[in-house]
């Protein structure tokens, strides 16, 4: 059972509510001393060791503060023992594998088991050039160190050919089978990426290495900027240059690909690659087949290593070297619609294409999941006002979501190209393990390419307070509004879960399951409401156009527009609406947005209508059979009741004897019947007596046989026989 309090058991002791209340009771004249430059102080620890009182402060208060500091140190040691920081894990890694080069630094470690005669539970440590495993079961230590250059094959396996939680690592002389992974796919991708870099003799820069560490362990590592080549975590809030954002996105694909594979939509990061890469899980299990599919990264190495190495992972960043195109040009980062759904209105194609390219280069989609990718028949400015202003649409949408205490601050900023605002509201929570509601603080940052640009990008960071493990994570969303035409705009919404501290695998899976469920429900509801607003807007525009056209016909009747006598025609507000082309790129919006010009039943497939008719006919037949069965049962019951009534009526209406002769005849018949019955009973009794006699005779013979065959019971000589 998980702790449902806002502060979980894995949070640091200094973040508990009781600890903060005690800190507030400390006198303001005694600030904690600053640590020396050469020392590091963990969060929640207190290095104050002064014993002297401060003038004007009661001695009881100083004694209480010293006791509190002592208790906080005990809690800090207890917390460090249960949840060691990255610094402690790295020190343990260097102690356990002291023969490795000193330049090797721990990137991530996973809990797993090595399959041998028995399962050896331990931890798998990954560095830039080595894979290490350590297990200690009742002083029985097992240590394995594998250099990545020596690995010839890397496969995903199944424990007992059923549970997909194992990885097999093969070298020229050995095979190691690691199982019981909590995040097998993520670990496999990271090992595969490091293996590729080792075979290609590529090294990670300090920035890339520390970004991987922060992705795996969070931002609180127990380190400072004075520890060797430590690099602080980079905040991906869209303020960096395109080159920096691209570099970091390429690295973050490693840790986020596990979540992207479970998404129904194709990953936006994967779609930005210059070539189509094979599926990693399929290609890595069959390395030779993967070598035939992708030949862009072959090197002259060992046969097995080169064949396995040439498989490019899904999250591979594009190479800077010029390569020959393998086939037709793939879609750009924003052209995710199939060819039959591409827009036919090319009046503003050049400007919209340039704007899409600029926005895609500046702020690409987040590396989590693409939740909305739809084209609406609404202008970009109007769509922005509907979503990011105090509009009736937003108010109605928040009321439908049952959000309360909504506070929208106005946009503030130096220019129209970069603005910021903060939203606060309370959301309902249906999770039985948590509270019924939670307060939310959402920070929105708006970016534009220019003051007159039609499109914009809004980054949103949502912090939910009052829920379990609130200090571990927060959610980030990116809204990208692109103006395609005067009355058309594309809305792309991507989301990801960002971690401040790395939780346990079980807690992380619980956080991701609940968070993604709520995020997907919210944005699917938003997409449906936008589709309804779009339909209402198109209907109102069609009515206005028809009213204007009828007025023109009344004034100029000879100039009435007719097409071969089919009736008056009027221009549609949009060519795509007239042709019935649905330009939405999301699967849910295709089912939730019917075409405007279609009839009430035109959007229903004929197969669905046929199935409905068959089901209705089957139900009618079943009802008729049930009625017939009920009638048959009722008829049988009524017939039986009728027969019984007739028999009783016949007895009731029978004629009784009137004279003495008739009574004498009846008495004679009764005596005769009685004598017959007595004779029958006598025969039955006589037969019973005969059977009893036979049984008695048999039992007597059996008793005689038993008495003769049994030996005498008294085998000991009697005492009086010895004297005779």
UniProtKB/Swiss-Prot annotation:
It is a single-pass membrane protein. The keyword Endoplasmic reticulum applies. Residues 367-538 form the VASt domain. Pfam families: GRAM, VASt. Residues 1-18, 326-336 have a biased composition (Low complexity). Keywords: Autophagy, Cell membrane, Cytoplasmic vesicle, Endoplasmic reticulum, Lipid transport, Lipid-binding, Membrane, Phosphoprotein, Transmembrane, Transmembrane helix, Transport. Residues 563-575 have a biased composition (Basic and acidic residues). PROSITE patterns: VAST. Expressed in liver. The modification Phosphoserine is found at residues 263, 267, 271, 415. GRAM domain binds phosphatidylserine in the PM and mediates protein recruitment to endoplasmic reticulum-plasma membrane contact sites (EPCS) in response to excess cholesterol in the PM. VASt (VAD1 Analog of StAR-related lipid transfer) domain, also known as ASTER (Greek for star) domain is a sterol-binding domain. Cholesterol transporter that mediates non-vesicular transport of cholesterol from the plasma membrane (PM) to the endoplasmic reticulum (ER). Contains unique domains for binding cholesterol and the PM, thereby serving as a molecular bridge for the transfer of cholesterol from the PM to the ER. Plays a crucial role in cholesterol homeostasis and has the unique ability to localize to the PM based on the level of membrane cholesterol. This is Protein Aster-A. The gene is GRAMD1A.
């Amino acid at each position: 059972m998980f702790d449902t309090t806002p502060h979980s058991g894995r949070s640091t002791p200094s973040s508990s509510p009781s600890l903060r209340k005690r800190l507030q009771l400390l006198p303001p004249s005694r600030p904690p001393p600053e640590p020396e430059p050469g020392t590091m102080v963990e969060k929640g620890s207190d290095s104050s060791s002064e014993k002297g009182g401060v003038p004007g402060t009661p001695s009881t208060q100083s004694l209480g503060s010293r006791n509190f500091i002592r208790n906080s140190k005990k809690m800090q040691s207890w917390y460090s023992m249960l949840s060691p920081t990255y610094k402690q894990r790295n020190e343990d890694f260097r102690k356990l594998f002291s023969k490795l080069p000193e330049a090797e630094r721990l990137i991530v470690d996973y809990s797993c088991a090595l399959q041998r005669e028995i399962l050896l539970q331990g931890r798998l440590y990954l560095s830039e050039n080595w894979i290490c495993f350590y297990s200690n079961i009742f002083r029985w230590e097992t240590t394995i160190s594998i250099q990545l250059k020596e690995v010839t094959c890397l496969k995903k396996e199944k424990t007992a050919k059923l549970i997909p939680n194992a990885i097999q690592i093969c070298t020229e002389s050995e095979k190691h089978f690691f199982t019981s992974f909590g995040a097998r796919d993520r670990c496999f991708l990271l090992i595969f990426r490091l293996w590729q870099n080792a075979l290609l003799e590529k090294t990670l820069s300090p920035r890339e290495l520390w970004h991987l560490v922060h992705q795996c362990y969070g931002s609180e590592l127990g380190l400072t900027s004075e520890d060797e080549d430590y690099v602080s975590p980079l905040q991906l809030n869209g303020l960096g240059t395109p080159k920096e954002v691209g570099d970091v996105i390429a690295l973050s694909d490693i840790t986020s690909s596990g979540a992207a594979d479970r998404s129904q939509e194709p990953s936006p990061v994967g779609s930005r690659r210059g070539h189509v890469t094979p599926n990693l899980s399929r290609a890595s299990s069959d390395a030779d087949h993967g070598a035939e599919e992708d030949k862009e990264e072959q090197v002259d190495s060992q046969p097995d290593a080169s064949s396995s190495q040439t498989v490019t992972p899904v999250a591979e960043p594009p190479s800077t070297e010029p390569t020959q195109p393998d086939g037709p040009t793939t879609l750009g980062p924003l052209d995710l619609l199939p060819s039959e759904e591409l827009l036919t209105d090319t009046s503003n194609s050049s400007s919209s294409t340039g704007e899409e390219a600029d926005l895609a280069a500046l702020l690409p989609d987040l590396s989590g999941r693409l939740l909305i990718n739809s084209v609406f028949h609404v202008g970009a400015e109007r769509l922005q006002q509907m979503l990011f202003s105090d509009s009736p649409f937003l108010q109605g949408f928040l009321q439908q979501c049952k959000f309360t205490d909504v506070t929208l601050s106005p946009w503030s900023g130096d220019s129209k190209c970069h603005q910021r605002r903060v939203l606060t509201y309370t959301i309902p929570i249906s999770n039985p393990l948590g509270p019924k509601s939670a307060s939310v603080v959402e920070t929105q940052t708006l970016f534009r390419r220019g003051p007159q640009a039609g499109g914009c990008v809004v980054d949103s960071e949502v912090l939910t307070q009052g829920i379990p493990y609130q200090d571990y994570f927060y959610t980030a969303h990116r809204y990208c509004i692109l103006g395609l035409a005067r009355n058309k705009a594309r809305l792309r919404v991507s989301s990801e879960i960002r971690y401040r501290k790395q939780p346990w695998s079980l807690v992380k899976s619980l956080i991701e399951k609940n968070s993604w469920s709520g995020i997907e429900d919210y944005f699917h509801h938003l997409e449906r409401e936008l589709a309804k607003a779009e339909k209402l807007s198109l209907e109102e525009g069609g009515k206005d156009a028809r009213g204007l056209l009828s007025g023109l016909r009344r004034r100029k009747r000879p100039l009435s527009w007719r097409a071969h006598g089919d009736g008056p025609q009027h221009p549609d507000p949009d060519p795509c609406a007239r042709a019935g082309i649905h330009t939405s790129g999301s699967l849910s919006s295709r089912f939730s947005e019917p075409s405007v010009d279609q009839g009430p039943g035109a959007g229903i497939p004929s197969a669905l209508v046929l199935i409905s008719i068959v089901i209705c006919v089957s139900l009618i037949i079943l009802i008729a059979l049930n009625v017939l069965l009920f009638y048959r049962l009722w008829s049988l019951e009524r017939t039986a009741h009728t027969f019984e009534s007739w028999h009783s009526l016949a007895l009731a209406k029978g004629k009784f004897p009137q004279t003495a002769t008739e009574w004498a005849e009846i008495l004679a018949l009764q005596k005769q019947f009685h004598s017959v019955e007595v004779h029958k009973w006598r025969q039955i009794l006589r037969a019973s007596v005969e059977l009893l006699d036979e049984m008695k005779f048999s039992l007597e013979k059996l008793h005689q046989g038993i008495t003769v065959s049994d030996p005498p019971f008294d085998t000991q000589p009697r005492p009086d026989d010895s004297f005779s």
